[in-house]
């Protein structure tokens, strides 16, 4: 009986000891576990910190790009020139270009249009190759038969290659009001090279204003039944807008066969083209900007 009482007392003391040891610890993590937990939290912060910095940097770049990108909207009809001397003309607006047609000579005084980067890279429609009289022309006009076996190409002023963005613009580029007699090696050579270069400049600068045409003189020879005038020379003047204003360049080509001439060697100030043609180019640009742009070629702005 004494032994039994002893066992009961011993068990009771053991229970009290276990209770005193474990119960106070129930609301606390072991020190080692608390430290590990802190390390895990710290590791997560360390992992997310670089990600946050990258996000911040990306946002900053987007903001910088947005603020440093400028879009220059050229006023409508800035490309339209003005004849300095009295000359017969009928101004006709087509989808892709505007033409000043001279019925006395059956050719244009000038053709003007804006070529955007979107238009320059478009391949929406194929070349037409259907040369037809311009239905809007009043008075005498050239006909296809005038060019037959003449030794001259039907040379585009506004090229078909610039009109691939619209089926209508493509068709209208083959109107004979947009065509002049050109020597084959001019039309298919350096003139074509300049047309292709213009598309590259339009892509580089977002938009390019183009005015092109024949140099009209009173002693031009004629061809065909309708006595279409044969120009002695052709011109093309170009302009685009930057954060520093307008930049312009001109070209003048004799109507002859060319071999190895480079485009850069044929480039001249727009003022020189104005003197040769009797045309005031880009007259709607403020005079101070126009005069600066046309006086000299800023070679740093034209890549060849």
Placement of each model-derived feature along the sequence:
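Domain-level detector for secreted/extracellular nuclease and nuclease-toxin modules, and
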Residues: 1-304
